[in-house]
């Protein structure tokens, strides 16, 4: 992997009997992306996340894609979620909340999220086709479930319009990227304080900051 200079950075290496995944995320980046998961459509969506979220993202993965893409897709999501949580740390100084509505031609998708430390996922995509190229459309939900459970995000995804499966999913990733970018950016008025009236936010895994 290349050199990353982001001040807020997460590095995760996940190895199982099914996959070997290495993820590096820089929150204060400019959208540099070097991704190779062996799942072409997932790579395309991760490029959207990096580009529109201004995340520096490096991911390499090998897995049992000769069976199907499920394990690689899920384990990449797990590692991305863990890397995000690691990079956010105690979440001091961030805006915390983010929202965005992204269009792609006829598709329109809304994403609202909270870097709360409490994982919750509400999913409202209605993808008309079972596959997008060779990618199983059900894996979109599984990717975000893995990210949410390992990052501690509260994430709501709503499809407002759309008939083309590729457009719907790409609009979703773009909206997620922009909402995440809004939430993780530093708020200078907070002066480094935790963005919670309790003075503390939980990190993924239930560890309080």
UniProtKB/Swiss-Prot annotation:
Belongs to the imidazoleglycerol-phosphate dehydratase family. Its main location: cytoplasm. Its EC number is 4.2.1.19. It holds the Pfam family IGPD. It comes from the Bacteria. Pathway: Amino-acid biosynthesis; L-histidine biosynthesis; L-histidine from 5-phospho-alpha-D-ribose 1-diphosphate: step 6/9. GO terms for biological process: L-histidine biosynthetic process. This is Imidazoleglycerol-phosphate dehydratase.
